[in-house]
Amino acid sequence: NLMQFELLIMKVAGRSGIVWYSDY
């Protein structure tokens, strides 16, 4: 599921302090 994948990315990115997913 793409939705779950995006949530996973946000969780990992937030933990790492990355905000590259904010472009979505």
Curated annotation (Swiss-Prot):
Its main location: secreted. Binds 1 Ca(2+) ion. Keywords: Calcium, Hydrolase, Lipid degradation, Lipid metabolism, Secreted. Expressed by the venom gland. One of its GO terms (cellular component) is extracellular region. Its EC number is 3.1.1.4. GO terms for biological process: lipid catabolic process. GO terms for molecular function: phospholipase A2 activity. The keyword rRNA processing does not apply. Transmembrane segments: none annotated. It is found in: Secreted. The keyword Magnesium does not apply. It comes from the Eukaryota. Its cofactor is Ca(2+). It is an enzyme of class 3 (hydrolase). It catalyses: a 1,2-diacyl-sn-glycero-3-phosphocholine + H2O = a 1-acyl-sn-glycero-3-phosphocholine + a fatty acid + H(+). Belongs to the phospholipase A2 family. Group II subfamily. Hemolytic and neurotoxic activities are not detected. PLA2 catalyzes the calcium-dependent hydrolysis of the 2-acyl groups in 3-sn-phosphoglycerides. This is Acidic phospholipase A2 4. It comes from Trimeresurus stejnegeri (Chinese green tree viper). The lineage of its organism: Eukaryota, Metazoa, Chordata, Craniata, Vertebrata.
